[in-house]
């Protein structure tokens, strides 16, 4: 698996370099779920596909920007699912964005998830790699990823990052969010899931939520590329995840590679509070 991780590092570095002088315009294409693709979405996907295709340990890749699974080496063991550029719609305002990767063994399923990674393209290039414990790495002047620290969640945080159009929230979710603000939680929501999860992780706690809404009853975020890898990282850091019913997002199973789900990531206190609010 280390070989797979090393090729992901190469792809992340190439994307970071390309971001220095990006074309932030839209292409004429849409991805599988109907999102109009930015030209840099397409370029990032091409970079990752090209790079991972050189890795003999990868059986197949699944991309948010591809309709179907792409088989690379049927004799290999690992399947890599990825969001090539999470938060790409924020490129024009120069917010931090990132790439998300999940490494599955043999079959894309939460129970087969063996490692997860995400990169942050911000003021500096950082990479979180998680097998047993999420570890933060930072690119140095020699183009090497240097270990910074292990990431751990506190039992309770102060950050509230909540997505979905507010007028379409269910009443129970609106009440839950209000209760957090009544406790003094701070709103920290950028519109890039990877950036918001990263802030919660590095600050030690809080909650990220993207609930079921009237206009998206099955949620909006994609299980295999976004939800599962970030849930894996949060839980390995000591946090909790749920869809509002289950006690872990990693309990969920889906047949379709572009399946979506409501999702909540956070410290133990916030997730326990949410489950109570959702199931009273």
From Swiss-Prot:
EC number per UniProt = 3.1.3.11
Extract one GO cellular component term from the record.
Answer: cytosol
Binding, substrate: 86-89, 189, 220
| Ranges that cross the membrane | none
| Residues at which Mg(2+) 1 binds | 64, 83, 85
MF terms (GO), sorted A to Z:
fructose 1,6-bisphosphate 1-phosphatase activity; magnesium ion binding
What Pfam families does the entry give? FBPase (PF00316), FBPase_C (PF18913)
- Going by the entry's taxonomy, the superkingdom of the source organism is recorded as Bacteria
Q: What family does this chain come from, according to its entry?
A: Belongs to the FBPase class 1 family.
Please identify the protein, giving its name as recorded: Fructose-1,6-bisphosphatase class 1
Q: Which gene encodes it?
A: fbp
């Amino acid at each position: 698996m280390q070989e797979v991780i090393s090729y992901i590092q190469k792809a992340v570095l190439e994307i970071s370099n390309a971001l220095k002088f990006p074309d932030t315009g839209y292409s004429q294409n849409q991805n599988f779920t109907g999102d109009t693709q930015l030209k840099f979405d397409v370029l990032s996907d091409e970079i990752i596909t090209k790079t991972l295709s050189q890795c003999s340990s990868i059986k197949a890749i699944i991309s948010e920007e591809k309709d179907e699974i792409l088989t690379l080496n049927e004799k290999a063991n690992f399947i890599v699912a990825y969001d090539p550029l999470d938060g790409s719609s924020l490129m024009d305002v120069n917010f931090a964005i990132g790439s998300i990767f999940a490494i599955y063994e043999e079959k894309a399923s939460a129970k087969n998830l063996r490692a997860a990674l995400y990169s942050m393209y911000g003021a500096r290039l950082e990479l979180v790699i998680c097998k047993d414990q999420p570890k933060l790495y930072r690119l140095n002047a020699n183009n090497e990823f240097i270990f910074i620290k292990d990431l751990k969640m506190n039992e309770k945080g102060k950050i509230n990052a909540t997505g979905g159009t507010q007028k379409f929230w269910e009443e129970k979710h609106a009440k839950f969010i209000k209760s957090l603000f009544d406790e003094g939680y701070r709103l920290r929501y950028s519109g890039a899931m990877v950036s918001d999860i990263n802030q919660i992780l590095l600050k030690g706690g809080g909650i990220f939520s993207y609930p079921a809404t009237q206009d998206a009853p099955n949620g909006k975020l994609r299980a295999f590329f976004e939800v599962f890898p970030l849930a894996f990282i949060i839980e390995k850091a000591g946090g909790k995840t749920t869809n509002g019913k289950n006690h872990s997002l990693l309990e969920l199973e889906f047949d379709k590679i572009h399946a979506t789900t409501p999702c909540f990531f956070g410290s133990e206190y916030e997730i326990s509070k949410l489950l109570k609010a959702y199931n009273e």
